[in-house]
Every structure is written in C-alpha cells, then in structure tokens.
Design a protein with these regions (language model features):
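C-terminal structural segment of proteins
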Residues: 1-290
C-alpha cells in the first residue's frame, strides 16, 4: 500500500475545506472498511486521507421525531443502527437485514454515510433505504442539499456527490401503513456479497394494493427502482397472480450485469423470482429472506 498522510479535522466544515475538488489524490475516510481494502489492492493510491472519525458526536446519533420520522447521523456505525430501538420501531426491516450484512467486525466500524457514499451496488442498505423513501443531507462549501437515496447513485461505484461534499445525515420518513421486506441471494456464504438484492415497500388498502416501491441491487450497476414493475401492481388485487405479474415485469425491465456471481440472464431470472418472494414476504409481515 502506498504511504499517505492522515488528516483528522474536528468539524464537518473543516473536513470539507480539506477536500480539494481538483485533487483526486485526497479522499475522505469514515470507517474505511471498503476503502482500505481497495488501497491495499492498489485500486486507489491517495496521498492524503481526511479522517472523519473525530467529527462531533451528533454526527453519530440516532433520533426519532414525534411524527414517526427517523434521523441517523452519517458517522453512526452500522452495529448501532442494528441495535437501535428507534430504528426497529420505524423501519424493522433495517436491523433484520443488518444481521446478515457482512460480519459483526465490519458492522462495528462501517458507517451509514460511508456505506452510501461508496456507491457499491452490492451493499444491502441502499436498496432498503430507497424502498423506504429515505433522503440524505449532503454538506458542501456553499451550504447543504437534500438528495433522495434513489437519486444518489450515478453508476457502478459512482454517486452524484461532489469531491468536496459529505453526507451528514440520513432521514427516513414516517412509514404509515407501508410494509417493507428485503430478499437477497448469495452464491457463497451468508456473509458474501449478494448476486441479487430486492427490497420492496407496499401499502395495502383492503384487498387492493394502494402503492408499491420495488428496488433491485447487486444484479445492476446501481441500486434502482423498477417503476414498470411498480405500475404493474398499483391498484390491483393482492394475490399471487399480481405478484407473478410484477416479477415478470421486473425481469423485463431490469438491465442486469454479468460478474463472478452469475450471468446477466441468470440474475434476471433471480429478479423475477425474488420480486415475487419479497412482495409476499412484505405482506406476510415484512422482514428479510434469502
């Protein structure tokens, strides 16, 4: 690994000042679980890392509002999210998914903000957050902006964040009567990266499906909603035929990529099956399935 300088600012504003948008050899580092592996492999060779570990504690907090919304600081470790009673109450699908996310050593170090800013399409959290309608706050030299998580990812390991822009907070809106589930397929161990991840959020009104959000990840270049599959469900009856229709629409719509975890045609068939399975899982009570 190439030697580098480590800077440790004490505030978010100071950290942003240290990030030169014209210098790609300066990178921020939060937990570092992904970045350090890439540096050891020689994928990245930064000459300077701006550590975010000494930022104020409010950037690691979890707070629930009276209206049912949830705010999670960008520096909050995934293990704290996993154990949070507030998260379990507002979005129980998240702590359930965390139990199958890598291993406890990684979850103790990896952060919410780093998980999103890294832009890795194989991660479990982004598709779930998209299904939940979550947003991030991103701070830059001229102020702050809100970005829907579904708009955050630009491509394979790419986000729309500027080089001198940092995620400060994640916000999950009140979920009302929506029920959410996440299913993934791993071709290796349970700790392995998934070949396909599917997150869904559905709201039922009587025997009719009022709304649906269907998100696929890992099989694609970025976590993304399948709006054609959502439209195939909206306003229809809640039955296995509707779930099959949505699965077929998802398989037709999705653009899968081939990699070591499977070919694009194989992953397309996984999407077909697991969209159907995730919808049933959500309406049966939510949760995580494999």
């Amino acid at each position: 690994m190439t030697p580098f300088e480590l800077l440790e600012p004490g505030s978010l504003a100071e950290a942003i000042k240290l990030l030169d948008p014209e210098d790609s050899d300066i990178r921020p580092i939060a937990g570092g679980t992904a970045l350090m592996l890439m540096m050891k492999a020689g994928v990245f060779r930064p000459r300077c890392l701006v550590s975010l570990r000494k930022l104020p504690p409010e950037l690691s907090r979890i707070s629930a509002g009276s209206g049912g919304e949830l705010a999670i600081g960008a520096m909050c470790p995934l293990s704290r999210v996993e154990r949070s009673a507030d998260v379990a109450r507002v979005a129980p699908v998240i702590p359930r998914a965390m139990l199958r996310l890598s291993n406890v050593r990684v979850r103790n170090v990896a952060t919410v903000g780093g998980c999103l800013a890294h832009g890795d399409p194989h991660m479990d959290l982004p598709p779930i957050l998209i299904a939940l309608g979550a947003q991030v706050s991103a701070v830059h030299p001229k102020g702050e902006r809100r970005i829907a998580v579904e708009d955050l990812f630009a491509g394979y390991f790419e986000t729309i964040l500027q080089k001198n822009e940092l995620i400060s907070e994640l916000r999950i809106p009140p979920q009302g009567g929506a029920r959410t589930a996440y299913c993934k397929v791993t071709t290796g161990s349970a700790e392995d990266w998934p070949a396909v991840g599917v997150a869904v959020s559905v709201e039922q009104e009587g025997s009719v499906l009022k709304s649906a959000r269907i998100v696929v990840s890992a099989a694609t270049e970025k976590a993304m909603r399948l709006k054609g599959a959502e439209q195939a469900l909206a306003g229809g009856a809640v039955d296995d035929q509707a779930f099959k229709r949505a699965g077929d629409a998802a398989a037709d719509e999705v653009e899968c990529i081939s990699d070591v975890r499977g070919s694009a045609p194989y992953k397309r068939e996984l999407v077909r099956v697991f969209v159907r399975r995730a919808l049933r899982q959500a309406l049966d009570g939510g949760g995580v399935a494999h």
